[in-house]
């Protein structure tokens, strides 16, 4: 389930949700609608009783979502930093704090000069129906190389090491047989007795400090030395980790590549790639996806694109079905 509710209570709207209306009370008559199409704001964000109305609205949808979720299912609630803390508490109440999975921060804009700190991230609060049996698939992104990253050195076929910037930080400019790498620590953060030993590299003897050990045993270290992967350091040796060894890395809970997307149809529409990652992490082809806050239909579009079944709905009176 992917929910993209209104972010807060501060924006104006043509339609006001009332939570204390009396039976048969008529509100929002058709004749009250403005004649100017641009004044009809479908994506409303205003509440009669302020935060109380907002949380009551969201809690109703979360309670229903909990009943609809499969035991291996997940729910993602998109929100800004204004009400992130309130939404997290609400999800704790409805789904149980034990089923909290993560808060994902994804970049939406570039800082444009604000009085205080610019807010350039929105958030997705992820909960499982049951964390013990939640469906999850790790996603990977290409590792970055060049200036500003750890992969900033090149080993030439002649075994000489030069900065990657000498090749304009472009893999296409590298000569055949060259490799991009970074130096990583050979000392483990803990202590493993079988990995405590001395070894010699070009006549220099190395031994881990007291209470520490190497990240591999003696036979593993010997293989690394034969492969010319062990490098001299000022005090301790390091390991030459080449970009080609594992050219991808797992996505964590901070997504920076979501800013600047050109697939938006209106200002508050969620980028395809944000919903795409959530779906690919937690569903398989043929699984059913629900979005009770359909809006522009981005969730349905992404679900259809990746072979998921989908249901969407919208409470706006100007929604088109």
How would you describe each model-predicted region?
Residues 1-288, 320:
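Class I S-adenosyl-L-methionine
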Residues 293-297:
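Class I SAM-dependent methyltransferase "Motif I" SAM/SAH-binding loop
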Residues 299-308:
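Conserved SAM-binding loop of SAM-dependent methyltransferases across substrates and taxa
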Residues 310-314:
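Conserved SAM-binding motif I beta-strand of class I
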């Amino acid at each position: 389930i992917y929910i993209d509710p209104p972010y807060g209570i501060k924006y104006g709207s043509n339609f006001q949700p009332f939570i204390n209306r009396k039976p048969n009370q008529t509100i929002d008559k058709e004749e009250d609608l403005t004649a100017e199409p641009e004044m009809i704001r479908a994506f409303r964000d205003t509440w009669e009783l302020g935060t109380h109305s907002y949380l009551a609205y969201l809690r109703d949808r979360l309670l229903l979502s909990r009943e609809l979720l499969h035991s291996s299912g997940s729910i993602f609630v998109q929100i800004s930093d204004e009400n992130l803390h309130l939404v997290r508490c609400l999800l704790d109440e409805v789904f149980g704090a034990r089923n909290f999975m993560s808060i994902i921060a994804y970049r939406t804009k570039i800082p444009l000069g604000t009085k205080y700190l610019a807010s350039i991230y929105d958030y997705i609060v992820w909960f499982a129906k049951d964390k013990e049996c939640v469906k999850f698939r790790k996603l990977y992104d290409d590792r970055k190389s060049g200036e500003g990253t750890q992969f900033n050195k090149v080993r030439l076929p002649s075994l000489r090491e030069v900065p990657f910037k000498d090749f304009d930080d472009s893999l296409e400019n590298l000569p055949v047989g060259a490799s991009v790498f970074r130096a990583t620590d050979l000392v483990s953060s803990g202590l493993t007795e079988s990995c405590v030993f001395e070894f010699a590299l070009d006549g220099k003897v190395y031994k881990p400090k007291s209470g520490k050990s190497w990240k591999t045993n003696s036979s593993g270290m010997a293989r690394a030395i034969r492969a010319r992967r062990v490098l001299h350091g000022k005090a301790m040796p390091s390991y030459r980790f080449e970009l080609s060894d594992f050219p991808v890395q797992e996505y964590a809970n901070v997504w920076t590549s979501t800013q600047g997307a050109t697939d938006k149809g209106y200002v508050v529409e969620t980028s395809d790639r944000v919903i795409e990652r959530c779906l690919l992490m937690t569903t398989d082809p043929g699984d059913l996806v629900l979005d009770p806050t359909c809006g522009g239909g981005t969730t349905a579009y992404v679900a259809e694109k990746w072979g998921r079944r989908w249901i969407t709905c919208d409470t706006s009176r100007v929604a088109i079905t």
